[in-house]
Amino acid sequence: MIRGNQIVVPDYQRAYSWEKGRQVSVFLDDLEDYLKSSVAAPYYFGHFLYEKTGEATYAVIDGQQRLTTIVIFLCTLFNRIREYREFSDEEQDLYEDIIKRRSTYKFSTVKYDNQLFKDYVIDQTKKDRYGIDTTSGSRIADAYDYFSGKVKDMELSHVEQLLHATAKASCTTHIVNNEAEAIQMFIFQNDRGKKPSHLEVIKAQFMYQIHIYGGEETDSLIEEVKNRFEHIYRSISEVEDFVEEDAVLLHTLKVYFNSLWESTPTERVNEEISKPTRLQFIKDFSLALERSFNNLARLNSDRNNDVNIEAALACGRYEIVLPFFIKAYTKGIPLSEISRMGKALGDLMLRDRIVKTRADLRSRLNDVFQQMETSVDDVVGRIIWMKEVGDRWWAYWNNNVLQLAVEANWHHNDHGIAKIILWKYENHLISSEGKSGYAPISYRSILKPHLEHIAPRTENGEKEAAGYDTYDDDFRENYLLRLGNFLLLSAPHNESIGNKPFELKRSTYDQLRQQREIQIMTETDRVWNKAKISERQKKIVDFILNNL
């Protein structure tokens, strides 16, 4: 299909999404298994769907992940052969037929990744990853580096075998003749390597609806949707470390229809594009999606400098928290007010994780979410009120319920929340010092936060010399697993001290304020016992009730 033609990945297709630890490695493993099997029939790459766009040009509609991977793999094979020797005439013809003939590239990916594809994969003029600003671009580089690493240790004969198997492989194809038909086919086709996301399918649906109903506006609307999704794809790399693209679609739906109860994006979108107002909805919702991705990128950046925002994200519950942030940014609410809202939301989400209630927060917050336009006062006020209210329907998160929960034992599955509490407690100690120039610390600044049991769960073999209380039933059941016996440490710190005597561990407690607090508490009496745990437990519980 590539020989004598030019293949392009159209902009309405999803960008490269195969991952080196999954589909990319399976691609090579399958080829290697084929070579070992000695099967006479050519290797089969599956079915491909194309749209004919010119005399010898085609847009790949289904199978682009496989086709992109094939081209990347072939480039690494050609590069490896070139390191051994000059191309044979047959190899030179093959390279020019399916990779590049003079200045003509035979395959092009989506336009925002295509220059990278040329520079990093085909021409190898780019040797580093600086400036790669899309997730798909990073995956292209990952796939190329993975294949390059695999073939660099291969014998020339094996590289030649792989090249022959790939170049001579068979496939089946289907060709359509216009973009509308191609988009419709894409909606109903599934790439066998990775199923399209809901966002990708909705994008294709938008473009198909424009082709059918756009009339004189078709070209301008298609261009608008393509541009919006190009910006969206660039933003994905800035937010994928904490939210998936289909989740952003759902959050956008909640903001667009102003309800935390929205839950079925594809059904809701299908409902809207079946109405006579479909074109206006497509324009408005595409803009809303672009804004959501941009605003989440801002949020991801702002949380690096604002512990209130970071804390609101630390507990998860994104299905509630993120729509509030997206809407606040969209409405142009000042960052200082967004931070104030983040403090309130973070406190409530942490309470929710601590008390472990099944009561639904959406029903308690949806009305203030809907009312938020230029101020966060109603949101913050509602959360403050929920901390004190005694009414049964509202009281699941109040101080009485919270105190019962924090005074209980904290088992292993609670450690993630305990670490967040102690991080917030650390910042409370910093602010309590009243010294200027000391900013709160970011949770992400602590290298792999660990939860340290000051008195270890397993009794130290040195008995009295260990510096801990007697490990009787009361100590094990009522002290070992309390917050007062927990300390926040980095992973290297925690792993270095292990189950050592208290005096040795105490000497290392000099990094965080809460660590130095332990040193101060035991300055005259170097024993960590029930009384010390109870004293510290009270400090932490008082902090929680007064500050969360």
Give the ranges of each region predicted by the language model.
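Betabetaalpha-Me/HNH-type nuclease active-site subdomain
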Residues: 28-56, 380-520
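Amphipathic alpha-helical interaction surfaces
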Residues: 76, 80-83, 191, 328-331, ...
